[in-house]
Amino acid sequence: MNLKKLSLIFLALTIGTQALAANSIEFGFENEQYEEMYNDSDTFNPYVKVNLNPKKDSPLLLELKYMYFHQYGKNRNEGHDARFKTNKKRIEFFASGYKYKNNNFTFSPKVGFRFEASDVNRTEKPKSQTDRMLNLRFYPNMTYDINEKVQFYVSGFVGPQINRVQHGTRKDNSYSPTSKDSAIYWHDWYQEMEVIGVKYKLDNKDTIWASLYNEYKRNEYKENYTRWQLRTGYNWNINSKLSINPFIRYDLSYVTTNDEATSDHGKEKDSHETRIGSTVKYKIDPTLTLGGEIYWQNAKTEDYKGKDNPDKNRMFYKLSITKAF
């Protein structure tokens, strides 16, 4: 996508926010950088996000986000004839506003979807690449207040995922290594849930929190992923304008199971990831907020024979500016 097209999208969304009683509009980017061995995965991802109130005095809130992924590492290392997808567009849409409260318990769900379309370069050798993905998502957000200081919570999403694999298919019963046809898989699944979390509010209004996180991803006739992770962090309100929120994520278990219709079906391999970082927010004025995030991540993986792969280290950077109306 060239700069002109991206500018037109930003302009259209900006005009739309005025027409639909926008709560806020956010512009930003994410950048992922890997060590030399894996740096073909380096990406730069600009985005725009809008929160809308379609009806005045209604609790209904609509969220729309557009992000463009430029995998410049792949272009840098393989050129314009790179065999794999190098660019991707993502659209997210969510609706929320309903809230059920019963004494100390609250239930405030959110529903929506994520859609991704990838640019896949065609080659003589068929490769299994997903060029379209639709993930329907339900967020069963719940909280329970023990007292004024302690709160338990559940957050995250669950939902089915539909993938179209281009230029070869996953290894199902009809797999052909020379096929260049597309195949759609309707029974994939994706969820990320903090199944139980706890927050403790300190006397100075800062918050300490910890949670048990589960990720499950099913790619039919390819691989299934099951992760259990410990997450913890500290929300530090330095003053009325600046907040810094350091966090740690540590895998307790991360198992990948082979789901191909081959002799490797059912084999497992272990992975382990550790992430250390922080988010930051600075309120420039009552309607303008600067945001950011940085983290370092180490990933250890192995193959289905139990052989360790070289560690995959990543640095992540994010910068955003949000205008409230």
Which residues make up each language-model segment?
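Cleavable N-terminal export/targeting peptides
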Residues: M1-E26, D57-L61, N309, F325
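Short glycine/proline- and aromatic-enriched beta-strand/turn motifs that initiate or cap beta-hairpins
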Residues: A21-G79, F316, T322
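Repeated loop/turn-to-beta-strand initiation elements of outer-membrane beta-barrel proteins
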Residues: N23-I25, K56-L64, Y100-S108, E148-V154, ...
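Transmembrane beta-strands of outer-membrane beta-barrel pores
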Residues: F29-M37, L52, Y66-K74, G97, ...
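Residues that define the transmembrane beta-barrel architecture of outer-membrane proteins
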Residues: D40-P46, V50, R83-I91, T130-F138, ...
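Residues on the lipid-exposed face of transmembrane beta-strands in outer-membrane beta-barrel proteins
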Residues: P46-P54, I91-Y98, F113, F138-Y144, ...
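Detector for outer-membrane/organellar transmembrane beta-barrel domains
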Residues: N141-S263
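Outer-membrane beta-barrel "beta-signal"
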Residues: Y282, I294, D311-F325
